[in-house]
């Protein structure tokens, strides 16, 4: 199944239900993300951008409203349905990165790629070189800087087919040069797949030419 659209309909984190929240183009509204388009979701700290990404990925369900994939509610999706979406339709780079600190950078990447068989060794090596961390590929992830870890996690997120890629503050610890390189790589992969990009930011955003900027 190809995933052409993701819609958040009347969605609101339950923790916000009893609170007065600022005007939002997503919370308590209807927002649709379409395959092939790129979106920047800007938010203030604590505005719920990480929650939004986790809801779309099915990692959390503590929200009011509806999450729709191709117009179909995800409310009753079982684990098998979610696993299928995560393996073939939605790639995800979480803000907390979720790397195994005792494994090397390359081992973290290969752990995922071993499950998908998606990216060739040469492609992975090319990404490592372009992002300036090839010389650190055999270092334990826990000994790398946060910016280096962010680049490792980005490469790992690309080791699968996808219709959408969710990027939660993907360049918060990168300088402008590495930000641009990361953006180029993401754009190349998304374009090759005809995929959509949903990137969040509280300030330092991924340097893409976005089709739409939305305020959370």
Provide a role label for each language-model segment.
Residues 57-58:
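Helix-to-loop junction immediately C-terminal to a conserved catalytic motif
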Residues 65-75:
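Conserved ABC transporter NBD signature motif
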Residues 165-169:
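Catalytic Walker B motif of ABC-type/P-loop ATPase nucleotide-binding domains
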Residues 96, 102-115:
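Q-loop/switch helix immediately C-terminal to the Walker
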Residues 121-136:
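Conserved ABC ATPase "signature" region
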Residues 140-148:
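Conserved ABC ATPase signature
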Residues 74-91:
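ABC ATPase NBD coupling module
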């Amino acid at each position: 199944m190809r995933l052409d659209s993701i819609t958040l309909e009347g969605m609101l984190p339950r923790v916000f239900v009893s609170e007065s929240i600022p005007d939002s183009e997503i919370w308590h509204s209807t927002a649709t993300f379409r395959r092939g388009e790129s979106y920047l979701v800007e938010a203030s700290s604590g505005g719920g951008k990480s929650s939004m990404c986790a809801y779309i990925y099915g990692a959390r369900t503590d929200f009011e409203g509806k999450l729709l994939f191709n117009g179909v509610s995800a409310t009753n999706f079982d684990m098998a349905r979610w696993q299928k979406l995560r393996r073939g339709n939605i790639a995800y780079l979480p803000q907390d990165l979720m790397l195994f600190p005792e494994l090397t950078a390359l081992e973290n990447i290969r752990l995922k790629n071993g499950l998908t068989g998606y990216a060739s060794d040469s492609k992975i090596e090319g990404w490592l070189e372009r992002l300036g961390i090839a010389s650190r590929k055999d270092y334990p992830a826990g000994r790398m800087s946060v910016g280096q870890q962010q680049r490792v996690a980005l490469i790992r997120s690309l080791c699968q087919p996808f219709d959408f890629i969710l990027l939660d503050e993907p360049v918060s610890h990168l300088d402008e040069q590495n930000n641009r390189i990361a953006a180029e790589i993401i754009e190349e992969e998304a374009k090759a797949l005809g995929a959509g990009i949903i990137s969040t930011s509280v300030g330092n955003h991924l340097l893409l030419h976005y089709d739409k900027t939305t305020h959370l």
